[in-house]
């Protein structure tokens, strides 16, 4: 796994050079809690499926040029439960264009099947990937802010799989004639200009 923890302007620039060339990017955040109003944004993660970047916002590192990747409408940003991440990004003055939500896609695909749409269970169903969520409990208001290798790996473990998951889901949405329903459901939680432009 090619990992960059981007702390300097040069590292942000290096990440931008590579990620700005992507057509799709997995994106995620780590936060201190569930409420963007009262919680803190600790990090923003990006992955093209091979190159994985974590920006440690908790250390005072701004996204810099990477904010342009979020607003670039030619790049699809893939989130799992986009509304959660978008709330925290918005609270920190970052906007995002062209969004795909793997959780909404999974809910559309599994409607009536009594299956969880959590990322851990979804990735296990598709790829037999077993996500270790044990590190998640460390991200709270009392966290010391130190990004250990284990925390970096945990934070990036979600985003690395999102590009491949989106491809699989889009294939199934198309095969089952559910693409329009997915767009309709996505539109319910996102402003119209943020929906996935690849459909």
Give residue spans per PLM region:
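An N-terminal structural lobe/cap that precedes and organizes the functional/catalytic core
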Residues: 30-49
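Active-site-proximal helix-loop-helix substrate-binding element of RNase H-like nuclease domains
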Residues: 5, 45-46, 50-163, 167-170, ...
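Short, glycine/acidic-rich hinge or "gate" loops at secondary-structure transitions
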Residues: 175-182
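Fold-independent oxyanion-binding glycine-rich loops
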Residues: 29-30, 81
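N-terminal accessory regions of nucleic-acid-interacting proteins
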Residues: 1-25, 29
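Short, flexible, glycine/charge-rich loop motifs used to bind or transfer phosphoryl groups or to couple energy/partner
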Residues: 14-16, 34, 65-68
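Short, surface-exposed beta-edge/turn micro-motifs
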Residues: 22, 40-41, 74-75
């Amino acid at each position: 796994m090619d990992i960059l923890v981007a702390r300097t302007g040069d590292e942000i620039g290096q990440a931008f050079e590579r990620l700005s060339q992507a057509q799709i990017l997995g994106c995620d955040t780590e936060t201190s809690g569930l409420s963007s109003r009262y919680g803190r944004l600790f990090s923003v993660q990006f992955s093209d499926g091979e190159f994985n970047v974590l920006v440690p916002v908790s250390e005072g590192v701004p996204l810099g040029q990477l904010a342009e990747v979020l607003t670039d409408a030619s790049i699809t940003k893939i989130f799992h439960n986009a509304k959660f991440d978008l709330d925290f990004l918005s609270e920190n003055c970052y906007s995002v264009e062209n969004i795909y939500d793997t959780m909404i896609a999974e809910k559309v695909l599994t409607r009536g099947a009594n299956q969880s749409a959590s990322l851990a269970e979804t990735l296990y169903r598709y790829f037999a990937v077993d996500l270790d969520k044990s590190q998640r409990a460390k991200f709270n208001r009392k966290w010391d802010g130190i990004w250990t290798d284990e925390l970096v790996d945990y934070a990036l473990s979600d985003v690395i799989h999102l590009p491949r998951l989106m491809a699989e889901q889009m294939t199934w949405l198309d095969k089952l004639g559910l693409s329009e329903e997915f767009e309709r459901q996505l539109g319910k939680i996102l402003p119209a200009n943020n929906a996935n432009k690849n459909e």
